């Protein structure tokens, strides 16, 4: 068998394996949080755009929510504006919020939209302020030490949390064969802007749309046990146990809680996948092995 025949045979095997998954997910909505290394490498960026376009072409409805922390940090540095973080959240005063909106809504969002469209998609860029897509309120952060009689409220500026999602707008775009690409900026009741964690926005969008899947691209291979082995399939109960015994800790906790809340809020499954792997999204949804950790509400028998 020639090399060309071998390659063709491999393609046929891949398509054969993917077909049952394509049939299962036709007409379903998948919310994908795009960030980390997957946004930095040209090869990975191109692969992501092609994945999104292919999903739409076979009848699946992708909705993209993106981050942009490093890009925000770079511009703040160039403008000689100091970055401060509390509990992993960027303290966002009015000046920093202007930069956040400029970078997320004006630069990163349009770059992603352009990339998807160059590969044959019809992407539309949005921030949460468009048609009040992401309604938000100020996030209350508290801290308490054993010496304190009551928690101290810490002001981290215009950092918000999601209180509502304009699903009518997203459903209209999806039905019109568009691919929504959302920057995680929320709008308050008086029109004020809020900087919101992209994972949290993706989770709330997935819940509101009753999405089939929430997919979070990360810079790790997936959730791991204490032996460093990737845990490919978990129930919400098992994840709770891993948090309780300290297997899941630190910076992964907010991401995992977001995935858990989405599943508990009606999303069929959440996926923590390795965005460093080319075509990670397709590998996770269209192959038997996947490239990360799937979390579901289904109990194991």
From Swiss-Prot:
Give the UniProt subcellular location, in the record's own words.
Cytoplasm
According to its UniProt record, which reaction does this protein catalyse?
N-acetyl-L-glutamate + ATP = N-acetyl-L-glutamyl 5-phosphate + ADP
Q: Which CDD domains match?
A: AAK_NAGK-C
Keywords, A to Z, come to: Amino-acid biosynthesis, Arginine biosynthesis, ATP-binding, Cytoplasm, Kinase, Nucleotide-binding, Transferase
Q: Which GO terms describe its molecular function?
A: acetylglutamate kinase activity; ATP binding
EC annotation from Swiss-Prot or TrEMBL: 2.7.2.8
Spell out the residues of the site Transition state stabilizer. 33, 255
Q: Quick one: which pathway?
A: Amino-acid biosynthesis; L-arginine biosynthesis; N(2)-acetyl-L-ornithine from L-glutamate: step 2/4
InterPro entries, per database record: AceGlu_kinase-like_sf, AcgluKinase_fam, ArgB, Asp/Glu/Uridylate_kinase, NAGK-C
A Gene Ontology biological process term: arginine biosynthetic process via ornithine
Main location per UniProt? cytoplasm
Any single GO CC term annotated in Swiss-Prot or TrEMBL for this entry: cytoplasm
Q: Name one Pfam family in it.
A: AA_kinase
Q: Which residues form the signal peptide?
A: none
Q: Which residues bind substrate?
A: 68-69, 90, 195
Q: Which domain of life is it from?
A: Bacteria
User: Its function?
Assistant: Catalyzes the ATP-dependent phosphorylation of N-acetyl-L-glutamate.
What is the protein name for this chain?
Answer: Acetylglutamate kinase
Q: Which organism is it from?
A: Pseudomonas syringae pv. tomato (strain ATCC BAA-871 / DC3000)
Which gene specifies this protein's sequence? Answer: argB
């Amino acid at each position: 068998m020639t090399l060309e025949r071998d390659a063709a045979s491999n393609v046929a095997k891949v398509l054969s394996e993917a077909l049952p998954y394509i049939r299962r997910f036709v007409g379903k909505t998948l919310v994908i949080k795009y960030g980390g290394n997957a946004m930095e490498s040209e090869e990975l960026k191109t692969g992501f755009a092609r994945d999104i376009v292919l999903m739409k072409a076979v009848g699946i409805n992708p909705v993209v929510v993106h981050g942009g922390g490093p890009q925000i940090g770079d511009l703040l540095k160039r403008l000689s504006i100091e970055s401060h973080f509390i509990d992993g959240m960027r303290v966002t005063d009015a000046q920093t919020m202007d930069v956040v909106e400029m970078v997320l809504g004006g630069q990163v969002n349009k770059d992603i939209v352009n990339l998807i469209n160059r590969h044959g998609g019809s992407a539309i860029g949005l921030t949460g302020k468009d048609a009040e897509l992401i309604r938000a309120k100020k996030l209350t952060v508290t801290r308490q030490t054993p010496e304190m009689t009551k928690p101290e409220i810490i002001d981290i500026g215009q950092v918000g949390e999601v209180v509502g999602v304009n699903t009518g707008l997203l459903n209209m775009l999806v039905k019109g064969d568009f691919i929504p690409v959302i920057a995680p900026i929320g709008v308050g009741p008086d029109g004020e802007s809020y900087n919101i964690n992209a994972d949290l926005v993706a989770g709330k969008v997935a819940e509101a749309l009753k999405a089939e899947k929430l997919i979070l691209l990360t810079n790790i291979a997936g959730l791991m046990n204490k032996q460093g082995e990737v845990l490919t399939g978990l129930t919400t109960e098992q994840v709770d146990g891993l948090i309780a015994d300290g297997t899941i800790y630190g910076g992964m906790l907010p991401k995992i809680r977001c995935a858990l809340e989405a599943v508990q809020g009606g999303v069929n499954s959440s996926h923590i996948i390795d965005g460093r792997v080319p075509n990670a999204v397709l590998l996770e949804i269209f192959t038997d092995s996947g490239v990360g950790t799937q979390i579901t509400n289904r109990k194991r028998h």
